[in-house]
């Protein structure tokens, strides 16, 4: 994949256009502030509450979602995946017309059809590959967070230019942008979260902690070894790759990686990952999650509560307090 930088993007594609950022959480705030700093006319659509007040305090023109959708040329929806469909149907769809653009930072709603846009509307994705706080921080430092763009519908013939312009306005083309499809971004994002970054890593940490504590080892030490020090390893990989990480750790640690890693995560794990990918690509995961969310997410809430009572969290709070500055 080619990496796209500033010289391939032109902010003039946004001249005379109003961008409505729908939602003002971490991503909404960061992207809105960066675009405004780049000279883009940005308004905020959000319901009354803390986010409404925060956007107003940041100096934005804030209004209802419906009003913002009516006024904007580009409607950038940055809400939780499970709420996109309802908000779109009630407050955005009535104000769409030919020539407008729908934008998102994650393709879930379009890939799994909770939003089915009219054919005469452009649909694009501009997705920073980092949390909102990081997007804003590196922008203010004069650099940019890498990102993705996608063109899902392009009746105007100008959708790609607009996506690149928005990416540039957010600083993403400074860091480097990759062009993909919404399906690629959605499937890969969900797969990474469920199998490696969240589902895989968290369960691996918990099993390691439980194994040591059940064998009689002090829980504080178990937390250090199985949870706390993960950041040290991930930072090394983040900055230099796996091979660089292996060159920094001890020979004993590296030998242990090759010696025991395949015993803990045998090839069968990869087969399970393939099944997970099939559940994502088929839409089964999305169906299950949307049904859960529609019920008020009782299972999700129960899992959250149970995790809060797990010894790894209780001990973790104790360990983290050691690093707090008084």
Swiss-Prot record:
PROSITE patterns: KARI_C (PS51851), KARI_N (PS51850). Its EC number is 1.1.1.86. Mg(2+) 2 binds at residues 189, 225, 229. Residues 1-180 form the KARI N-terminal Rossmann domain. Binds 2 magnesium ions per subunit. Residues 181-326 form the KARI C-terminal knotted domain. GO terms for cellular component: cytosol. Pathway: Amino-acid biosynthesis; L-isoleucine biosynthesis; L-isoleucine from 2-oxobutanoate: step 2/4; Amino-acid biosynthesis; L-valine biosynthesis; L-valine from pyruvate: step 2/4. It catalyses: (2R)-2,3-dihydroxy-3-methylbutanoate + NADP(+) = (2S)-2-acetolactate + NADPH + H(+); (2R,3R)-2,3-dihydroxy-3-methylpentanoate + NADP(+) = (S)-2-ethyl-2-hydroxy-3-oxobutanoate + NADPH + H(+). NADP(+) binds at residues 24-27, 47, 51, 132. The active site is at residue 106. NCBIfam families: ilvC, PRK05479.1. Involved in the biosynthesis of branched-chain amino acids (BCAA). Catalyzes an alkyl-migration followed by a ketol-acid reduction of (S)-2-acetolactate (S2AL) to yield (R)-2,3-dihydroxy-isovalerate. In the isomerase reaction, S2AL is rearranged via a Mg-dependent methyl migration to produce 3-hydroxy-3-methyl-2-ketobutyrate (HMKB). In the reductase reaction, this 2-ketoacid undergoes a metal-dependent reduction by NADPH to yield (R)-2,3-dihydroxy-isovalerate. Belongs to the ketol-acid reductoisomerase family. PANTHER family: KETOL-ACID REDUCTOISOMERASE, MITOCHONDRIAL. This is Ketol-acid reductoisomerase (NADP(+)). It comes from Akkermansia muciniphila (strain ATCC BAA-835 / DSM 22959 / JCM 33894 / BCRC 81048 / CCUG 64013 / CIP 107961 / Muc). The gene is ilvC.
């Amino acid at each position: 994949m080619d990496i796209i930088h500033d010289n391939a993007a032109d902010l003039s594609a946004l001249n005379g256009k109003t961008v409505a950022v729908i939602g003002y959480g971490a991503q909404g705030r960061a992207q809105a502030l960066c675009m405004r700093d780049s000279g883009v006319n940005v308004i905020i659509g959000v319901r009354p509450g803390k986010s409404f007040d925060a956007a107003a305090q940041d100096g934005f023109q804030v209004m209802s979602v419906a009003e913002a959708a009516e006024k904007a040329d580009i409607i950038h929806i940055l809400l939780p995946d499970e709420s996109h469909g309802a908000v779109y149907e009630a407050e955005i769809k009535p104000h769409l017309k030919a020539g407008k653009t729908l934008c998102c930072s994650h393709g879930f709603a379009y890939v799994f059809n909770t939003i089915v846009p009219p054919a005469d509307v452009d649909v694009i994705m501009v997705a920073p590959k980092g949390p909102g706080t990081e997007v804003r921080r590196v922008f203010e430092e004069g650099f940019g967070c890498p990102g993705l763009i996608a063109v899902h519908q392009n009746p105007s013939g100008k959708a790609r230019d607009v996506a690149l312009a928005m990416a540039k306005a957010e600083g993403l083309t400074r860091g480097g942008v990759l062009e993909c499809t919404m399906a690629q971004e959605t499937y890969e994002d969900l797969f990474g979260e469920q199998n490696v970054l969240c589902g895989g890593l968290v369960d691996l940490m918990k099993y390691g902690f439980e194994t040591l504590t059940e064998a009689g080892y002090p829980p504080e030490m178990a937390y250090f070894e199985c949870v706390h020090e993960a950041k040290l390893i991930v930072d090394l990989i983040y900055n230099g790759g796996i091979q660089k990480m292996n060159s920094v750790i001890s020979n004993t640690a590296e030998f242990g990686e090759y010696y025991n890693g395949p015993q803990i995560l045998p090839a069968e794990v990869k087969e399970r990952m393939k099944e997970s990918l099939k559940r994502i690509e088929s839409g089964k995961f999305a169906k299950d999650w949307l049904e859960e969310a529609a019920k008020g997410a009782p299972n999700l809430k129960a899992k959250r509560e149970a995790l809060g009572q797990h010894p790894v969290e209780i001990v973790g709070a104790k360990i983290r307090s050691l690093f707090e500055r008084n």
